[in-house]
């Protein structure tokens, strides 16, 4: 049995949900998967930091109030966000990074990942910024230090589209994909089909926790553009930057557009797509598309996400699932940790 020491960077909904999963299921993982997780450090810009090489109680962390400086309530805790110290010095084997996405330069999350990889620590993250903007550098750094850099949760939260495509569809020669990759925009479009105007639909999404106070990144397609870069670079061997992906959001769609689509047996969807062209180049875009009701993505409603992969051997393969949610995204971090453990186990068996 292996025990992995874990540091949580960012302690909002996702890493808090991961702490709750550890509290509830650690013994189950020991029996079923052959490992347990021990939290040895937590740092958060708002809550502060705490470190203990002997381990922190996961249940107590999960119950911690979401109030400024709350980490100071714990033995050894402080109101200060000691990000670098926690990442470098708490003795963690794995860093679970779940801070906010900065679509401009990927900071500070990119630095958090870089510090960990340079110190020979595995990194699992749900953050789109570091992968979309600095993915090649960070993957090279991970290889150089013989550690893993995993980011399954960066595209569709707990729905394992990256690993499914790379493993289950390996050898099928994926030539492109198109997907509904943002739950907020899809919720807004579904609400508009129910008669709400755009502004009302956005307000409802905010009230339900699907949309941020500033919904621009979601409804204007910027969030999806980062995900298209990640998927295209990972699955199509592209070298795209965000500037290579044309981007148009849904804010210009009116109720008249939605109603006309209904009469024509079609639905508007915000689609992120990339395709390998005959000359080997990659075309990528984010835009509202009018899909006929028999299209595999047309039936995807509310905050659900889906992606349809096109391959030479299988044609179209469509995967749908939750594209948001604290527990679902925390599961993506767990999935990455399981992958790290299984890879390490195979290496050990190979050397025996």
Swiss-Prot record:
Description of what induces expression: Up-regulated upon growth on canavanine.
Domain of life: Bacteria
Keyword Membrane in annotation: no
Pfam families associated with the record: Homoserine_dh
Record's keyword terms, sorted: NAD, Oxidoreductase
GO MF term list: homoserine dehydrogenase activity
Top EC class, one word: oxidoreductase
Entry's EC annotation: 1.1.1.3
UniProt cross-references to InterPro entries, sorted A to Z: HDH_cat, HDH_CS, HDH_short, NAD(P)-bd_dom_sf
PROSITE patterns: HOMOSER_DHGENASE
GO BP: threonine biosynthetic process
Reactions mediated catalytically: L-homoserine + NAD(+) = L-aspartate 4-semialdehyde + NADH + H(+)
Keyword Transmembrane helix: no
The protein's role, per its UniProt record: Dehydrogenase involved in the degradation of canavanine, the delta-oxa-analog of arginine, allowing growth on canavanine as sole nitrogen and carbon source. Catalyzes the conversion of homoserine and NAD(+) to aspartate-semialdehyde and NADH. Is highly specific for NAD(+) and cannot use NADP(+).
Family: Belongs to the homoserine dehydrogenase family.
Protein name: NAD(+)-dependent homoserine dehydrogenase
């Amino acid at each position: 049995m292996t025990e992995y020491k874990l540091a949580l960077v960012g302690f909002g909904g996702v890493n808090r949900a991961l702490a709750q999963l550890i509290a509830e299921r650690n013994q189950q993982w020991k029996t079923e998967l052959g490992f347990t997780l021990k939290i040895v450090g937590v740092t958060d810009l708002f809550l502060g930091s705490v470190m203990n090489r002997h381990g922190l109680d996961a249940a107590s962390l999960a119950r911690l109030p979401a109030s400024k400086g709350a980490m100071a309530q714990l033995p050894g805790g402080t109101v200060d966000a000691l990000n670098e110290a926690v990442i470098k010095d708490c003795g963690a084997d794995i860093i679970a990074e779940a801070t906010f996405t900065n679509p401009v330069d990927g900071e500070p999350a990119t630095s958090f990942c870089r510090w960990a990889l340079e110190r020979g620590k595995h990194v699992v993250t749900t953050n789109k910024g570091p992968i979309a903007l600095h993915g090649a550098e960070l993957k090279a750094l991970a290889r150089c230090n013989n550690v893993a850099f995993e980011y399954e949760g960066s595209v569709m939260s707990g729905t394992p589209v990256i690993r499914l495509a790379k493993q289950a569809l390996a050898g099928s020669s994926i030539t492109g994909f198109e997907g509904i990759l943002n739950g907020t925009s899809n919720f807004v479009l579904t609400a508009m089909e129910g008669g709400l105007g755009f502004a009302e639909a956005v307000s409802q999404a905010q009230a339900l926790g699907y949309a941020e106070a500033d919904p621009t990144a979601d409804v204007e397609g910027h969030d999806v553009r980062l995900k298209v870069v990640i998927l295209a670079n990972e699955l199509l061997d592209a070298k795209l930057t965000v500037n290579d992906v044309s981007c148009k959001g849904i804010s210009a769609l009116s109720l008249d557009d939605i109603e006309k689509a209904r009469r024509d047996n079609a639905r508007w969807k915000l689609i992120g797509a990339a395709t390998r062209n005959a000359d080997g180049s990659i075309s990528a875009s984010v835009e509202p598309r009018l899909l006929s009701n028999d299209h595999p993505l047309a039936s995807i409603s509310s905050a659900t996400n889906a992606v349809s992969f096109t391959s030479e051997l299988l044609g179209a393969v469509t995967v749908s699932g939750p594209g948001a949610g604290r527990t679902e995204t925390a599961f993506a971090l767990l999935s990455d940790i399981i992958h790290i453990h299984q890879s390490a186990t195979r290496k050990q068996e190979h050397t025996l």
